[in-house]
């Protein structure tokens, strides 16, 4: 699989792709591969903690959606030229503590990040699945 066959700067369900294939494709393209398995997360805070740990966010990460956006965009942008990103959020919770509205708010942050990187002509692809 080659990343060129997947439209850049999007957020979509992982259905048609395997995590290992996405990781290999990111590696072959020289892009960052960011993976978070959120199978034990039950709440918004659990999800943010899981993403922060998996993506090795700095200790000062504010653990809210604004801070998530900052870590996915501005903080990375300031660290120098970026080759592109493949992000996988696997097993997002689907329960009353992390309901559809919470999932949409989280995915909107990643859509905004995709737009941010797209404006800079940097590919950003985010894939997700639910528990």
Describe the function of each predicted region:
Residues 1-131:
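Positively charged, polar, low-complexity stretches
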């Amino acid at each position: 699989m080659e990343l060129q066959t997947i439209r850049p700067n999007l957020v979509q369900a992982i259905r048609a792709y395997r995590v290992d294939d996405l990781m290999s494709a990111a590696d072959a393209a020289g892009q960052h591969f960011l993976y978070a398995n959120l199978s034990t997360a039950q709440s918004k805070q659990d999800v943010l903690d899981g993403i922060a740990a998996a993506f090795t966010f700095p200790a000062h990460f504010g653990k809210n959606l604004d801070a998530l956006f900052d870590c996915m965009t501005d903080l990375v942008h300031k660290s120098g030229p970026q080759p592109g990103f493949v992000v996988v959020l696997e097993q997002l919770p689907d329960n009353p503590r992390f309901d559809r509205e919470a999932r949409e708010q989280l995915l909107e942050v990643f859509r905004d990040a995709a737009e941010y990187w797209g404006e800079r002509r940097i590919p950003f692809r985010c894939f997700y699945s639910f528990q």
